[in-house]
Regions:
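Active-site-adjacent betaalpha module
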Residues: 1-35, 69-74, 99-228
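A short alpha/beta connector and helix-capping loop motif
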Residues: 32, 49-82
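Acidic-leg catalytic submotif of subtilisin-like serine proteases
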Residues: 35-45
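Short, flexible, mixed-charge acidic loops at enzyme active sites
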Residues: 91-99
Length: 228
C-alpha cells in the first residue's frame, strides 16, 4: 500500500491526486542508527488531573511503553523533552501573552511549582542513561543542544512520540527534517487535544516530512537493529 492509498477514505481523492502530481509522499524510512524522541509526556500533559492535559488515552500510554521497551531492548538512544520549569518570564517569552488571563495578563500556570507536573510515569520515563532536553518553545530543537547531542552519538534518524501532534510534535518533526534527520512517527504514540488537528497534521507530516505508520510497522522496521 502506498502512502497515498492509506489515507483514502479520510482525504478526498481529488486532494490526494494533487499530492501525487506534486510527487509528495515518498517514504524516508530509518537510517543506520535511530533514536527515540519522546516529547512532553510528563504528568502535566498525560494526567487528567492537570488542566493542560487533553487527548491522551490509556492506549496512547500503552503505545509509549511498547516503543520505549523496544528501544531499551535494542540499546538504542532515548531522548526526552519537557518544558523548562524555571519560571522567569523572559524564559517563557511570548507564552506570557499567548497563555494569559485576559483580565489580568497573568501567566496561566497553576502548576509552575508542582514538581510532579514535570515528571514522567515510571512505565516509560527516563532512566539515568537517557538524555532530557529542557525547552521553552514548541520544537525541542529550537535553542537547545539536541542536534549537537544527536550528531555526537551518530544518530541519523528519529522515532518521534508524544504530545501534541499539532504543536510540539509537528514542530520537532519539521525541524528534524530541516536538519536532515529521517523521521518516523508511530500514529498510536502521538496524541492531541483535537482529533481533527491530530489527523490533519499526521496527514501533512506523512506527505511532506516523515513517515507516519502504525506501531506494528514501526516495531517491524526496528527489527533490523540488533543489540550490540
Amino acid at each position: 500500500m502506498s502512502k497515498l492509498d492509506r489515507w483514502r477514505g479520510q482525504i478526498p481523492d481529488a486532494e490526494l491526486a494533487t499530492y501525487a502530481k506534486g510527487m509528495f509522499a515518498h517514504p524516508v524510512g530509518l537510517g543506520r542508527y535511530p533514536a527515540l524522541l519522546n516529547i512532553d509526556t510528563t504528568y502535566m500533559f498525560v494526567d487528567p488531573a492537570y488542566p493542560q492535559c487533553g487527548g491522551p488515552t490509556d492506549d496512547f500510554q500503552a503505545a509509549l511503553v511498547a516503543i520505549t521497551d523496544v528501544f531499551r531492548k535494542l540499546d538504542l538512544p532515548i531522548y526526552y523533552s519537557r518544558r523548562d520549569d524555571r519560571a522567569q518570564p523572559v524564559r517563557r517569552g511570548l507564552w506570557n501573552e499567548k497563555l494569559a488571563i485576559p483580565a489580568t495578563g497573568a501567566f496561566i500556570d497553576s502548576y509552575a511549582h508542582d514538581p510532579r507536573a514535570d515528571e514522567w510515569p515510571p512505565s516509560y520515563g527516563p532512566r539515568p542513561q537517557d538524555c532530557v532536553i529542557l525547552k521553552n518553545k514548541p520544537s525541542c530543537f529550537f535553542g537547545t543542544p539536541l542536534e549537537s547531542f544527536l550528531r555526537y552519538q551518530g544518530v541519523d534518524s528519529l522515532v518521534v512520540v508524544g504530545v501534541a501532534t499539532s504543536g510540539c510534535i509537528r514542530a520537532a518533526v519539521v525541524d528534524a527534517f530541516s536538519h536532515n534527520f529521517r523521521v518516523v512517527v508511530p500514529e498510536e504514540a502521538v496524541s492531541d487535544r483535537s482529533a481533527a488537528a491530530h489527523w490533519a497534521n499526521l496527514f501533512d507530516i506523512d506527505m511532506k516530512y516523515a513517515d507516519v505508520k502504525p506501531m506494528r510497522e514501526v516495531i517491524k522496521m526496528l527489527g533490523k537493529f540488533s543489540v550490540g
